UniProtKB/Swiss-Prot annotation:
Designated name of the protein: Lymphotoxin-beta
Species: Mus musculus
Pfam families on file: TNF
THD domain segment(s): 154-305
Locations listed in the record: Membrane
Family, as annotated: Belongs to the tumor necrosis factor family.
Lineage: Eukaryota, Metazoa, Chordata, Craniata, Vertebrata
Length: 306
């Protein structure tokens, strides 16, 4: 007869029950071991996605806040030179101050500080220069433009010329010489001016000579004179009067080589004189044989100035 299996209380066999318990325990253990990693993986898979959404939401809200701050920030635009020259409107300054205070109250941190600095900088540049003249500063009167002399005023310009048998003479129509507005010239009587008035008289006479050759006595000094006289009118024919005079002293140097070389000098002067109609002006020269007759060297004239 075969051997019977173990039996427990009540006569039930114990081998099958133990096997079932062992299988159930192993199944529970395996299920527990698999559930833990799956749960961890599920948590790790869900948590980063959720956190990523939160980061995007935070970044989006920060960008919107920065945009609102940029929109509310005042634009720092340099004023043009024309705006600086205009008179500022006092009603605009309280609005600018209120806007600065509102911006400072709504903004915090470095952005608010930079906004306050920009507002203060704009406030410093805002006052414009007053273009109205200061009553305490004396304004200089504008001078009247200068005008040329009236072309109708009498004037004359005569140039020296050599005349055979007479020596020094004066030309009234050659080169730069002219007579204007009734002025007349006669070689024997001189220059006649038609109107009473103040005249500017001038005279320039060029002189030239030759130094003595070597072996002769030392040359003496020469005093060259030129003068303007007036005659006629209230002074009578025989009573000339000296108006202006110039003089120059020359001491020629002996030429040690041979024949003496040429030397040059000039005597020039000018001034104002009160002349009357009918009076005549003429030139008196001390050394007519030494006069330089080249162009631009010898001349005299008169022009009415008042």
């Amino acid at each position: 007869m075969g051997t019977r299996g173990l039996q427990g209380l009540g006569g039930r066999p114990q081998g099958r029950g133990c096997l079932l318990l062992a299988v159930a325990g192993a199944t529970s253990l395996v299920t527990l071991l698999l559930a833990v990693p799956i749960t961890v993986l599920a948590v790790l898979a869900l948590v980063p996605q959720d956190q990523g959404r939160r980061v995007e939401k935070i970044i989006g809200s920060g960008a919107q806040a920065q945009k609102r701050l940029d929109d509310s920030k005042p634009s720092c635009i340099l004023p043009s030179p024309s705006s600086l020259s205009e008179t500022p409107d006092p009603r605009l300054h309280p609005q600018r101050s209120n806007a600065s205070r509102n911006l400072a109250s709504t903004s915090q941190g470095p952005v608010a500080q930079s906004s306050r600095e920009a507002s203060a900088w704009m406030t410093i540049l805002s006052p414009a220069a007053d273009s109205t003249p200061d009553p305490g500063v004396q304004q200089l009167p504008k001078g009247e433009p200068e005008t040329d002399l009236n072309p109708e005023l009498p004037a004359a310009h005569l140039i020296g010329a050599w005349m055979s048998g007479q020596g020094l003479s004066w030309e009234a129509s050659q080169e730069e010489a002219f007579l204007r507005s009734g002025a007349q010239f006669s070689p024997t009587h001189g220059l006649a001016l038609p109107q009473d008035g103040v005249y500017y008289l001038y005279c320039h006479v060029g002189y030239r000579g030759r130094t003595p050759p070597a072996g002769r006595s030392r040359a003496r000094s020469l005093t060259l004179r030129s003068a303007l006289y007036r005659a006629g009118g209230a002074y009578g024919r025989g009573s000339p009067e000296l108006l202006l005079e110039g003089a120059e002293t020359v001491t020629p140097v002996v030429d040690p080589i041979g024949y003496g070389s040429l030397w040059y000098t000039s005597v020039g002067f000018g001034g104002l004189a009160q002349l009357r109609s009918g009076e005549r002006v003429y030139v008196n020269i001390s050394h007519p044989d030494m006069v330089d007759y080249r162009r631009g060297k010898t001349f005299f004239g008169a022009v009415m100035v008042g």
